[in-house]
Amino acid sequence: PWIDEVAYLNNSIEQIPNDEFSYEGLFGKVIADFETAYNVLPEKQSDGGRVNKIAAAAYLAKCYLGLAWGDGYEATTGVNHINEEYMRKVVIYTDEVANSDYDYLEDFGDIFLPDYKNSKESVFAVQCSDYKDDNTSFGRANWSNMLNGCWGMWSCGWDFHKPSQNLVNAFKTKNGLPMFDDYNNEISYPINGEVNEQKWDPRLFHTVGMPTYPYKYEAEYTMTKNNSRTPNTYGYYTSLKEVPQRSKGETYNGSWQAFAMNDYVFRFTDVMLMRAEAFIELGELGKARTIINDIRQRAANSIDKHISYAKEQCEIALYPESYFQDKETARKCLRWERRLEMAMENGRYFDLRRWGIASTTLNAFFASEQNNVYDGQTYAQYYKDAHYEADKNEFFPIPYNQLYYIPGLYTQNRNY
């Protein structure tokens, strides 16, 4: 249901049904709020991290991109349901971001270090801080990520938010380009110091912590297989982006430790990928290629500063024009780029749902991931019974207690 301040003022929350507005109608309500923000906020704020007109434009672009593909259910979402008017809105609002003071940070690794909080890459982020710097007793910590440090590296490292083998495989390259069709044919992973024919997109080493490699670039904190809590269940990989370097220490002054890493809502690259997506669906493939190659060039430039130890294992190239001669191939490039660039940043499922390919992608993932082996250790057996049902699982069901509490008020979501 749509519940705003009027519902609270009128004490009418328990009288509001969940089918009062359509999918498009609900988006319209959200868009109206962001349009108000867009019209009244300044383009620049004096303090880093404060919301501004450009952040509102990014939100508007994301709303229109969500609407442009359909209503979220697979049968009525995807390439056969494109709304070009909404796609043009995406271009209009991302144009505001593209022509602002925001830009790509020069090195991909810097994006996820505390020293670069509120940089030109950060269009909007949830702000966190260190108690030693913010004049508070304990610090305004990022509790959402406190459990994601790898096991044995942090006092709060409980090894949550684990990358999959499928994701690691997706970073494979051949002649510098993604292996679209056969990336997942066999399990592969790099080992520090071992160079072979298989090369990798450099962003792998900024995104996924792996045994034998320095943890977040620091050789004195090299990961081993002992840094995984339950490898026979969840494997040996760990997520790197959302945690600081170990030498920086934990930054919450209390019995439980947490981090002062900001939580990105929009970074510049994310918005530019949204822009490229809209360009492809509007037939402007050359403009999309330019954006995607700019992002890949930044990745290519992000080896020497932080991951020189993996230099011989990295290979990345720009897309030639031949990859952007038709929408189908261009889409494949865009979607792959979005997966690699935004990996472990929490938006993957919503990308798949928006494109109308969640069921095929996730069910194939479940089938392959249950066969994982790392150095003789099998894991991920919990995927054996996993299944995603199209035109049902795109949205959660209305909880039974809500249906029971106010009989007849709510309509259960489709196929539950």
Regions from the language model: what does each represent?
Residues 145-147:
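Nucleotide-sugar donor phosphate/pyrophosphate-binding loop at the beta->alpha transition
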Residues 125, 152-164:
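Active-site core of glycosidic bond-cleaving carbohydrate-active enzymes
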